[in-house]
Amino acid sequence: MSSKYPRSVRRCLPLCALTLEAALILLFYFFTQYDASLEDQKGLVASYQVGQDLTVMAAIGFGFLTSSFRRHSWSSVAFSLFMLALGVQWAILLDGFLSQFPPGKVVITLFSIRLATTSALSVLISVDAVLGKVNLVQLVVMVLVEVTALGTVRMVISNIFNTDYHMNLMHIYVFAAYFGLSVAWCLPKPLPKGTEDKDQIATIPSLSAMLGALFLWMFWPSFNSALLRSPIERKNAVFNTYYAVAVSVVTAISGSSLAHPQGKISMSYMHNAVLAGGVAVGTSCHLITSPWLAMVLGLVAGLISIGGAKYLPGCCNRVLGIYHSSVMHYNFSLLGLLGEIIYIVLLVHHTVWNGNGMIGFQVLLRIGEFSLATTIALTSGLLTGLLLNLKIWKAPHAAKYFDDQVFWKFPHLAVEF
């Protein structure tokens, strides 16, 4: 029988992280430079504000959204910040290298930083399926692989299907969800007897998670409009996302009460259902020209989110063996799929309205993009999961899953692990 004491990462974590950071510094020294163009000052400030909104979403929003576990809230917040910082650095280099042929100096602009931040957001979505079961060394590996896979997907889809930045960004929902679920499927599945309570949501951490959801709710319009170039499309994206998430809040509270036998509201449902409209409307937010359609999408997305949170976790536990109380992945995968379908419907309507006869071709292109992104997400996720199972990473023992004491010093404890 193996020991239940956690495996120390004192040697491998500093060595791995600092060596990687030194390598990134060298790459930035030799292969990057700042944008020397004289950009309009007003446009510069506006561009920075969008990037600032994305950073707040990533660091505070997603960081606290995953902090609802009873004994794993410290690690959830701090590890998310660690992955964000590492992911942005690698994404800037990767996007620059993949977008240039022949290779040259990577020019760093505010737009490239926004693009890199969205790549790191993918990791923060997918890692929710494995937080509590892996250590920081394994998360470093996961960040590098997922950011690389997502960057490859963007490059391939952009070159083959001639897709713009916004449409590439909107594949992030489904890509991140299926990548994370694939990784989780490869990890040890059932929790050991006597440790199930660690996977439960506590009152105070759940309130912190709701704080993260509020930050995401406020800044989701900035996320959906971050990579759009046209001012009219950006305006439509902001308006439609705002109305969609507003309706999602009303639907989340009402639907949560309806789903409970005594009519009580579940905070765990609220964490994700309030964001449902923003996910569902994201792909087509720039095409919708009337608020009522965005509001309908917010209503439908909120109901799907509540239904998925109530019924899908048990189904996935039995069929896939993925034991996790969080419902974020079911929301992002289902609502990302809904958003893709709505986009295709609106695209067909727009094509018919303008008298263009290439309807079937346009639909096939969109289905091809979605299928390619999903396939690469599943494949790279499975490979990452198998890689994380290697013993060299010193993964925590299953008895120490969802336990902050494995990674953090608690001053009030007389004996540390």
UniProtKB/Swiss-Prot annotation:
Q: Where are the transmembrane segments?
A: 12-32, 44-64, 77-97, 125-145, 172-192, 203-223, 238-258, 265-285, 287-307, 331-351, 358-378
Q: Where does the UniProt annotation locate this protein?
A: Membrane
Q: Which domain of life is it from?
A: Eukaryota
Keyword field: Membrane, Transmembrane, Transmembrane helix
Q: Which GO terms describe its biological process?
A: ammonium homeostasis; ammonium transmembrane transport
Say what the protein does: May be part of an oligomeric complex which is likely to have a transport or channel function in the erythrocyte membrane.
Q: Which family does it belong to?
A: Belongs to the ammonium transporter (TC 2.A.49) family. Rh subfamily.
* Protein name from the UniProt record: RH-like protein IA
Organism expressing this protein natively? Pan troglodytes
